[in-house]
């Protein structure tokens, strides 16, 4: 499975790691899992340092629209994306611009910096 994730309800944190060929369907499956776990408001880290994105501009626009549609479900927690490769980093930046949802979102090249930033974000779960 290209995206594996863990939801920690006690710490209100979702950690996702993408590996291999990353497609739209993989990310949609992850998002479905987050919604099903009632974890939209949790802090999230999405590590795509081991993934090769196979996402078109249309795919990124569809993901952005999906994230914006989640706003009606309640608060959306902060997101740290870790992407080191040029294409991954570029697509992460495009996703961040398209998925504006009144929440902090930041892109990092190093996992420990992403985690440090995410840990400094306030809990928005109420």
Where does each model-flagged region fall?
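Amphipathic, Lys/Arg-enriched alpha-helical "gate/interface" segment within cytosolic domains
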Residues: 1-126
């Amino acid at each position: 499975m290209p995206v594996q994730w863990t939801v920690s309800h006690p710490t209100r944190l979702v950690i996702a790691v993408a590996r291999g060929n990353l497609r739209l369907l993989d990310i949609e499956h992850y998002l479905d899992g987050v919604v099903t776990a009632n974890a939209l408001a949790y802090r999230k880290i999405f590590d795509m340092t081991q993934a090769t994105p196979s996402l078109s501009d249309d795919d990124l626009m569809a993901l952005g629209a999906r994230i914006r549609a989640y706003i009606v479900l309640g608060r959306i927690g902060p997101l740290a994306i870790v992407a080191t490769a040029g294409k991954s980093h570029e697509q992460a930046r495009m996703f961040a611009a398209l998925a504006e949802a009144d929440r902090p979102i930041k892109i990092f090249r190093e996992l420990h910096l992403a985690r440090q930033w995410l840990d400094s974000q306030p809990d928005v779960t109420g």
